[in-house]
Amino acid sequence: VERSRGLGDVYKRQEFMKAGGSYAIVFGKKLQSFACKVLNVELKSAFAPSKQIYNEGQGFTAVEKIFNANAVGIEEDVFLHAGSDVRVKVNIVGSQDTTGLMTSQELEAMAATVISPTVDGAYQSGCHTASVWDFKAQENTPRLMKFMHKFGLITARDPKDSYHSMTDVIHKVLNDITVDDWSIIIGGDSHTRMSKGVAFGADSGTVALALATGEATMPIPESVKVTFKGKMGDHMDFRDVVHATQAQMLKQFGDNVFQGKIIEVHLGTLLADQAFTFTDWTAEMKAKASICISEDATLIKSLEIAKDRIQVMIDKG
């Protein structure tokens, strides 16, 4: 009993327990850093410091650069390497329809009523329930769309039925509304993978916090760099390249070195749809996420394609 009591005292000292829940900690940190920025004073956090790792003389991976560029609540001259815990600004958020109801409940629990103004774009999908439009889906999905529409998200189905339901899957829509390689995307689906920026699949609570605060907290993952050489044959589809990557990785290492890491592709000439084919496959390889660095000309072409698709969405209401 004494041993258990001593263990309990350790847990009581944890911040989220002292605060009465994780939401209080998240909002407390956000308010504190925001107040210091407005008042132009140095941040002296009342909270326990996050784990910060900096290796002198070591360069930065693409994901480390993205995380440092979007980091919140750290000093300007501090640069972090993989393994560091960091709060980051989230640019794009996706909520999918099977977990969306839980996300809406989380938002209600934290008394959030409108999407964070720092989020560039957010989408509530209807693609998972669209194929099985049973009585439960017919009851829950319109209610979910009404809530998310009012909250400030683009919704796959219009609560007022003034436009046709969108059949595009969540990943494709998020790809189209992501505009640059420096974006951080959070989506309520394990296959949240983007052709631009770096995207992470997340639980309903993390999605809710990203929508409400425009931020997420996570460790900076380690990376594995993938380099392509030569020219793809005319008879080949890009999916052949994807399968060849897996085969070569297993032949070279004998084990799945992608698991839990970021896969970085520095080819630069992959258009959005090809890049998505690759990044979507990385979910099957149990990678944490994937990054496809684009050359400027390639990024412009991808954005033109995305612009046409978004225009179709606008034209349909």
Predicted regions and their residues:
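Flexible, glycine/charged-enriched surface loops at secondary-structure junctions
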Residues: L43, E75-G83, S116-D120, I154-S162, ...
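N-terminal amphipathic, basic-rich helices that act as targeting or association modules
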Residues: A46-D120, E264-H266, L270-F276, A289
